[in-house]
Amino acid sequence: MDMHPWLPNIKYIEEMLKSIGVNSIDDLFIDVPEEIKLKKELDLDYKKPLSEYEIILKLQELQNKNKRLKMPPFLGGGLCPHYVPEVVKFIIKRSEFYTAYTPYQPEISQGLLQALFEYQSLIAELFEMEVVNASLYDWGSALAEAIMMANRINKKKTVLVPKLMNPYHKEVVKTWTYGKGIKLVEIPPNERGTIDVSKLESMINEDDVSAIYIQQPNFYGIFEDEIEYIVDIAKKKKIITIMGVSPLALGLIKPPGEYEIDITVGDGQELGLSLNFGGPLLGILATRWDGQLVRQMPGRIVGLTKDSEGKRGFTLILQTREQFARREKATSNITTNEALMAIAAAVYLSLLGRNGIKELAKEIYIRSHYAKKRLEELGVNTVYNGDFFEEFAVDFRTDYDIIHSRLLEKNIHGGLKLGKTQALFCVTEVHTKSMIDELIESIREVFSG
């Protein structure tokens, strides 16, 4: 009787072992030292395989051990809770989209390609940039790719970054650029928490500066207010400018394109993506219409063309940049991307529209400043005095661990600990006035003993 071709069994295993010239599966691990091999059964709570129903009961038992917060977390740090409309969830669960497979065959992928083209178009309009790729992993990876783009263009090794940039992004960049010998040099902040341009001017006299990075707003939520001046300095020195920007903040501030920024990066998490222990996210990367910049872009780019019959069609373009075509000569080794998340962002942006983004940004600004005002009533002041959006850092002048643990006892998650006494709070449209008031009263109780 023939064996089923897709089910593993002893005969197949024997044939595979014979074909590679070993006698047993143990021989495959001969290079692993004996002292670190596991030579006993796994110490599990159950001694036999479980049925599907028993597994579900076990998982529910574990799930019930989780504590549930009574309100969205106030945890800052670059990823914040936002409301995800039901239509976004519905559309990305459709079988036509629910895959990360790259649409190499345009003749059977017009729907997916058009959806990604719409995403690129919407981001281009929001950022006022001209070329957008079809997504990267997250903000950190997009920034690393932008820095390596700059390095490939001008061959220089130093990148000036704000001291108050997102530290998690900085760690990603250090990891990605280590092999290239790229050096990050921090620009100190002023008392407002923005880039100290007087210090910057003395730092960019070096001939080896490849790029200047500006984060808008920065890790502390503070708006940079001298971007035009920084860009002007960079252009005079022929230094590439990179801006990382919060998409929702663009409902209040000038987009990167108005500053003539060379490369823009960001994260689409706030454009219709839920928080799931930090992922999946959506790396955004956009450039000016410049041949050098576009040719050095990483990732997929969807273009609009016409077929042999003159009909409109969508297809992947400039594919000779990519690793499946060029291998080690590619602009990046990034492959399966965040296409599903890009479609979610496209649906979200289409749903809100230009006016919706402005109204949402205004609401976030008002609520976050209300929270800051209420904290000031308790004698808790911000670390920097610059204007901010969504996130702000405060100094409690006492051990924040004590405050945070007491908040958790009330099922309230406070801000991100920055130091012994400081924390970064995030307030968005999902935090109502009553939630903010309850947070303040809970902190007041901690202060009163």
From Swiss-Prot:
What EC identifiers does the entry list? 1.4.4.2
> Which InterPro entries does UniProt cross-reference here?
GcvPA (IPR023010), GDC-P_N (IPR049315), GDC_P (IPR020581), PyrdxlP-dep_Trfase (IPR015424), PyrdxlP-dep_Trfase_major (IPR015421), PyrdxlP-dep_Trfase_small (IPR015422)
SUPFAM superfamilies named in the record: PLP-dependent transferases
Q: Please give the biological process terms from Gene Ontology that the record holds.
A: glycine decarboxylation via glycine cleavage system; nucleoside metabolic process
Q: Mind telling me which Pfam families this protein's record contains?
A: GDC-P
* Any one GO molecular-function label of the UniProt entry: glycine dehydrogenase (decarboxylating) activity
Q: Which domain of life is it from?
A: Archaea
Record keywords: Oxidoreductase
Q: Does the keyword Mitochondrion apply?
A: no
Q: Does the keyword Glycoprotein apply?
A: no
Under catalytic activity, the entry for this protein gives: N(6)-[(R)-lipoyl]-L-lysyl-[glycine-cleavage complex H protein] + glycine + H(+) = N(6)-[(R)-S(8)-aminomethyldihydrolipoyl]-L-lysyl-[glycine-cleavage complex H protein] + CO2
Q: What class of enzyme is it?
A: oxidoreductase
Assembly = The glycine cleavage system is composed of four proteins: P, T, L and H. In this organism, the P 'protein' is a heterodimer of two subunits.
Chain's role: The glycine cleavage system catalyzes the degradation of glycine. The P protein binds the alpha-amino group of glycine through its pyridoxal phosphate cofactor; CO(2) is released and the remaining methylamine moiety is then transferred to the lipoamide cofactor of the H protein.
Record-stated family: Belongs to the GcvP family. N-terminal subunit subfamily.
Q: What is this protein called?
A: Probable glycine dehydrogenase (decarboxylating) subunit 1
Q: What's the gene?
A: gcvPA
